[in-house]
Amino acid sequence: MYAIVKAGGHQEKVEVGDVILVNRLDAKKGDTVEFPVSLVVDGDKVTLAAADLAKVSVKAEVVNDEAKGPKIDIQKYKNKTGVARRKGHRQKLTIVKITAIA
């Protein structure tokens, strides 16, 4: 059984026991969070109807609330003017472990 959930602005395919990275959530380590479900597949049975999906919930436990993504370098350069700028960015992430699809 797996589900497609909306987590941190993205959609993720999850099963029970999966550990996923999502954009920073307002939750502390050890907290339980619940994600809205877009699709559930259980063997040959596919659930898409909004009324049926309202009954389904995906629960996850926050493993790490202070993770960071990879460093991204941004460079800006203007020829012949001496203008150059270098900047970096690391996205703040939350690591969650899926505990239940019910």
From Swiss-Prot:
Top-level taxon: Bacteria
Keywords: Ribonucleoprotein, Ribosomal protein, RNA-binding, rRNA-binding
Entry's Gene Ontology cellular component terms: cytoplasm; ribonucleoprotein complex; ribosome
Entry keyword Mitochondrion: no
Pfam family, one: Ribosomal_L21p
UniProt record, GO biological process: translation
Coiled coil region boundaries: none
rRNA-binding as UniProt keyword: yes
GO molecular function, one term: structural constituent of ribosome
The protein's assembly and partners: Part of the 50S ribosomal subunit. Contacts protein L20.
Family: Belongs to the bacterial ribosomal protein bL21 family.
Xref: HAMAP family: Ribosomal_bL21 (MF_01363)
General function of this protein: This protein binds to 23S rRNA in the presence of protein L20.
Protein known as: Large ribosomal subunit protein bL21
Organism from which the protein derives: Bifidobacterium longum subsp. infantis (strain ATCC 15697 / DSM 20088 / JCM 1222 / NCTC 11817 / S12)
Gene behind the chain: rplU
